[in-house]
């Protein structure tokens, strides 16, 4: 189930899937990325994307999974996560993080959760679909870096660190 309550019906389990069977892999938004982040089956599956022509798209906190799989080592990206995560997870490269609603680079599309329209448009266009610029009324506001930078308050950060210890 996605963070917005969408249910996703898989057609294969990861053990039976190869990333090469797909033109595109989309990672939906997740409120709590920790279970997926520490699921080696997911990370191993994602690692298969490296050096392929498979489009990979991740929104909200899901780019964390791409980072752990090493797919963002030399790629600019964005994500809807708290900046303290950059200090906690060594696989997130601060120099590659961009404060933008959507970032596309090297067949990887990442977005902050509220930019779901732009995310959908970018995925469709990358797959060769003819999509009008006003498809689903994309965001027209320019956001400042400050508006796109998220921090936990001290108590929420401590709660996250405590939860992280369980992994």
Which residues fall in each region the model found?
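Active-site-adjacent pocket-lining segments in enzyme domains
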Residues: 6-57, 61-167
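Membrane-interfacial amphipathic helices and adjacent loop/beta segments
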Residues: 1-4
């Amino acid at each position: 189930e996605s963070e917005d309550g969408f249910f996703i019906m898989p057609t294969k389990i990861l053990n039976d899937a190869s990333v090469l069977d797909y033109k595109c892999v989309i990672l939906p938004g997740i409120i709590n990325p920790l279970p997926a982040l520490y699921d080696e089956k997911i990370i191993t599956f994602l690692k298969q994307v490296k050096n392929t022509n498979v489009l990979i798209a991740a929104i909200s906190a899901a780019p964390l999974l791409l980072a752990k799989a090493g797919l963002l080592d030399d790629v600019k990206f964005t994500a809807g996560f708290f900046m303290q995560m950059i200090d906690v997870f060594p696989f997130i490269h601060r120099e590659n993080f961009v404060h933008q609603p959507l970032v596309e680079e090297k067949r990887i599309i990442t977005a902050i959760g509220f930019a779901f329209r732009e995310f959908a448009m970018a995925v469709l266009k990358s797959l060769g679909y003819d999509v009008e610029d006003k498809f689903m009324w994309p965001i027209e506001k320019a956001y400042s870096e400050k508006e796109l930078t998220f921090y936990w308050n001290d108590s929420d950060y401590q709660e996250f660190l405590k939860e992280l210890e369980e992994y």
